[in-house]
């Protein structure tokens, strides 16, 4: 039936994922184009370490949103690590410094050091996207995620961070209580807010991210794969892990299928793919599976993206 339910006006975030090389960015671009054609204001965002939105739409891109197609409210943004770290420092830098400087005398440059810690970039990426969605500037955000392993780690981080905060709050507060008693003696700074208030705000942020990504009414996850052994195995793994994290996976795109058995090579490929499609159907029981045939053309430029968009949202193969 195509990706019909993605066009629901209540949907605010469409996450497009899969392993590298399966056409994930192409599918995300086609989905974003269709939603823009539906009259919605759309941001197509890529967090892939090697983004290709600029190549697909044949338009230069930098660290600001740019209009991708004339006549439509379709904008694109390729988010680099530098952008994420810069915005993280703007949002959390003062709070981090307030906490750390209450214990020790440090320069504000210490915030840069904290920003390089493992997981910071991924955690803030989710916060950045949720803020984009809830800010109201766009009707819907289509997120071309990084390859599978990176994305799974990213989506687990808010839960892990929240568990750490809940377990660590007592320790932090005990230490802070002791320091409060000797502040005058050692000339430690008094913060404008209590440490507990800052920690609680971080906990609330993680809960907000978790709730949003698990909200099946506003968030859709589209998984892109190929009909080969590796694609099937990774699809099974991703479906299981995403379900374990409470994420709604309602749509699967099987890409690069051979349409016709017009030569021995295509005959063998098609037979192999049909076998794996049956396996994928078993894995995706209850979900919408859309098949996408391999194009003889490079997918770049509005016309080719439009062809893919039509194929993804049409009722038949």
Question: What do the PLM-derived regions correspond to, one by one?
Answer:
Residues 2-8, 206-317:
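C-terminal lobe/tail of nucleotide-utilizing enzymes
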Residues 1-22, 27-200:
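Nucleotide-state-sensitive switch-loop elements of NTP-binding domains
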Residues 123, 203, 274:
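Electropositive phosphate-/nucleotide-binding environments in soluble metabolic enzymes
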């Amino acid at each position: 039936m195509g990706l019909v339910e993605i066009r629901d006006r209540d949907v605010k975030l469409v996450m497009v994922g899969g392993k590298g090389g399966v056409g994930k960015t192409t599918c995300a671009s086609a989905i974003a184009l269709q939603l823009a054609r539906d009259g919605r204001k759309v941001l197509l965002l890529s967090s892939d370490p090697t983004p290709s939105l600029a190549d697909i739409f044949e338009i230069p891109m930098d660290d600001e949103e740019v209009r991708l197609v004339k006549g439509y409210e379709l904008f694109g943004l390729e988010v680099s690590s530098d952008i994420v770290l810069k915005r993280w420092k703007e949002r959390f830098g003062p709070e981090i410094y307030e906490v750390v400087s209450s214990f020790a005398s440090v320069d504000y440059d210490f915030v840069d050091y904290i920003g390089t810690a493992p997981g910071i970039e991924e955690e803030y990426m989710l916060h950045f996207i949720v803020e984009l969605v809830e800010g109201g500037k766009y009707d819907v955000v289509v997120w071309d995620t990084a390859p599978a392993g990176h994305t799974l780690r990213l989506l687990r981080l808010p839960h892990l961070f929240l568990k750490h905060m809940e377990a660590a709050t007592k320790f932090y507060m005990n230490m802070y209580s002791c320091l409060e008693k000797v502040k005058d003696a050692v000339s430690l700074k008094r913060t404008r807010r209590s440490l507990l208030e800052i920690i609680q705000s971080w906990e609330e942020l993680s809960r907000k991210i978790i709730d949003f990504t698990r909200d099946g009414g506003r968030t859709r996850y589209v998984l892109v794969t190929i009909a080969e052994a590796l694609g099937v195995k990774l699809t099974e793994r991703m479906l299981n892990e995403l379900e374990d994290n409470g994420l709604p996976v309602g749509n699967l795109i099987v890409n690069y299928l051979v349409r016709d058995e017009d030569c021995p090579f295509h005959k063998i490929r098609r037979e192999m793919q049909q076998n794996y499609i049956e396996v994928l159907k078993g894995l995706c029981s209850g979900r919408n599976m859309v098949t996408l045939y391999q194009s003889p053309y490079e997918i770049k430029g509005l016309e080719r993206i439009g062809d893919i968009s039509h194929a993804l949202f049409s009722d038949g193969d």
